[in-house]
Amino acid sequence: MPGAAAKGSELSERIESFVETLKRGGGRRTSEDMARETLGLLRRLITDHHWNNAGDLMDLIRREGRRMTAAHPPETTVGNMVRRVLKIIREEYGRLHGRSDESDQQESLHKLLTSGGLSEDFSFHYAPLKSNIIEAINELLVELEGTTENIAAQALEHIHSNEVIMTIGFSRTVEAFLREAAQKRKFHVIAAECAPFCQGHEMAVNLSEAGIETTVMTDAAIFAVMSRVNKVIIGTKTILANGSLRAVAGTHTLALAAKHHSTPLIVCAPMFKLSPQFPSEEDSFHKFVAPEEVLPFTEGDILEKVSVHCPVFDYVPPDLITLFISNIGGNAPSYVYRLMSELYHPDDHVL
């Protein structure tokens, strides 16, 4: 069928284009954009490709998912969305196969630990499976649309009048959170500039335009100012499996200062940033960029004598974090393992 061939060719080009974008670091796209685009491509894969049963479909999704994640391992959102789709396929197949939802939801610790050794037969064919999966993916896309608004809606529960809030760098989620609180509360924000990228300046400008009293400071002043701060509110790139963070460089310093002064540290992050990865996975954790901002290339004499690294991310241990605020509510870092079991199947942690 020429129509099907044309569709397949167009889809292959779109996936190839997305993979090339990932290889270049994703450009100016946000994690939410990446999540939405990944889901859109996977939905097209499910509708356009011919598959006979859930097993065939999961193999297809895994194959394309590995290709996407390998293009740029630090962009964990892509892999997270692939795992969410695999979980959806398992759930929809289970419903048609006659497995009860209750047995899935109330998993014992023993079942969570041993599920990797059990295998389920996905070879049965069910006609409604495709439409059910597409409907579930559409619901997930709708959920993605409202993640920032759902997080911002909780702002008044955490920010009170005349408080001093500290943040670092630029986060759209944190900006929306603070803007929402500013509609009914008056407070002061201190933004660490997050050198060498200095995204804190962009955050300060945006908050000032919203009528929020904002001060920018250097990263070196974080500890000195922390004694005046009531709360630290930050965003993150990834929430790791042990409840720790992969956040912008400088966040670990901020978290240590907050811990020393017993200042609560709140992390605003949607659920699609929750990843089953651990900090030991170096390929996907670390990301380095050109150190020109730290040590300009014009300093030729010095450059000959030193080796300079400019990491983009910091590791923040879970014991430095007070609370996660996501689109489904607030949770302590110790609860992350439970959220993980609700979002991803243990067999899909490694694609």
Swiss-Prot record:
Keyword Transmembrane: no
InterPro entries: eIF2B_beta_subunit, IF-2B-related, IF_2B-like_C, NagB/RpiA_transferase-like
One Pfam family this sequence matches: IF-2B
Primary localization class, coarse: cytoplasm
Annotated TM spans: none
Regulation: Activated by the chemical integrated stress response (ISR) inhibitor ISRIB which stimulates guanine nucleotide exchange factor activity for both phosphorylated and unphosphorylated eIF2.
GO cellular component: axon; cytoplasm; cytosol; endoplasmic reticulum; eukaryotic translation initiation factor 2B complex; glycinergic synapse; postsynapse
Subcellular localization: Cytoplasm, Cytosol
Task of the protein: Acts as a component of the translation initiation factor 2B (eIF2B) complex, which catalyzes the exchange of GDP for GTP on eukaryotic initiation factor 2 (eIF2) gamma subunit. Its guanine nucleotide exchange factor activity is repressed when bound to eIF2 complex phosphorylated on the alpha subunit, thereby limiting the amount of methionyl-initiator methionine tRNA available to the ribosome and consequently global translation is repressed.
Subunit description: Component of the translation initiation factor 2B (eIF2B) complex which is a heterodecamer of two sets of five different subunits: alpha, beta, gamma, delta and epsilon. Subunits alpha, beta and delta comprise a regulatory subcomplex and subunits epsilon and gamma comprise a catalytic subcomplex. Within the complex, the hexameric regulatory complex resides at the center, with the two heterodimeric catalytic subcomplexes bound on opposite sides.
Protein name (database record): Translation initiation factor eIF2B subunit beta
